[in-house]
Amino acid sequence: MAVLNSNPEILLRKRKNNDRKRLEKQEQARQRQLEQKKKNDQRSKKFVRAETLVSNYKSNELENKRIKHITKFEKQSQADKISQAKEDDESAKLLFIIRIPDHTKGLKVPSKARKVLHLLRLNRPNTGVFVKLTPATVPLLKLISPYIVAGKPSLNSIRKLFQKRACISVIDEETKEPRITKLDNNGVVEDKFGDDLGCICIEDLIHELATLGEHFKTVSNWILPFKLNAPVSGWGPQAKLAKLQYSNEHQRKISLAGDAKLNEIDIDQFIDEQN
């Protein structure tokens, strides 16, 4: 059994090191904020052509019209939704939702859609979360349909995501601040859910999500959004050309109708390409 060193000099040195690390991290965070503010100031002073302003205005106008149509349609069919609520558990299915870059450059996401994206923790492109699809969640997903792709993942895809991308937030023992760490230890799962949920390994979490178990929400909220690779990366001329070609090939038609359906894709292939 290891004996803890109780030498006052060593304890004082450790305490000073922890204080120094904490101050260094605070200074680094302050520098990042200053750099971000400087970039934002430069971006705000950037010259914008009149044609760009008109294009952005029309795009935002169409997007707001789409949100308005969906909201109106959902209000009118609210009575049907109440009767369907009893069938939620029977008709529910698992979806994996990935946030994609905005379909139109310069588009400002409407507040209702932005709130749904924030609720799902999809604040950045190329991040994904598991969602339990029910009649109650369909209207919310329709609001954000231009900003996401969705589909039913296979058990193999879920396992691949956990093996390569699963991360959680933990409290650092030294700095007492939250930090992100990879979920690759069954002991962490057992310490977190062993007594309450009976989950003692990562495979138990995968089973809970895949089968839409009783503790689906607790497990999915504990795991941070999965960060996927961008389909095309880089900043050089070839990368810009590749991004343009990818954008043209994957251009999506967006319906303004209030009763537009939520389109689902082969999410397994999408995960394989960006995992």
Curated annotation (Swiss-Prot):
Belongs to the universal ribosomal protein uL30 family. InterPro entries: Ribo_uL30_ferredoxin-like_sf, Ribosomal_uL30, Ribosomal_uL30_CS, Ribosomal_uL30_euk_arc, Ribosomal_uL30_ferredoxin-like. Residues 14-45 are annotated as: Disordered. Involved in the biogenesis of the 60S ribosomal subunit. May act as a specificity factor that binds precursor rRNAs and tethers the enzymes that carry out the early 5' to 3' exonucleolytic reactions that generate the mature rRNAs. One of its GO terms (biological process) is maturation of LSU-rRNA from tricistronic rRNA transcript (SSU-rRNA, 5.8S rRNA, LSU-rRNA). Its main location: nucleus. PANTHER family: 60S RIBOSOMAL PROTEIN L7, RIBOSOME BIOGENESIS PROTEIN RLP7. Transmembrane segments: none annotated. PROSITE patterns: RIBOSOMAL_L30 (PS00634). It comes from Debaryomyces hansenii (strain ATCC 36239 / CBS 767 / BCRC 21394 / JCM 1990 / NBRC 0083 / IGC 2968). The lineage of its organism: Eukaryota, Fungi, Dikarya, Ascomycota, Saccharomycotina. Residues 20-44 have a biased composition (Basic and acidic residues). Gene3D superfamilies: Ribosomal protein L30, ferredoxin-like fold domain. Keywords: Nucleus, Ribosome biogenesis, RNA-binding. Pfam families: Ribosomal_L30. This is Ribosome biogenesis protein RLP7.
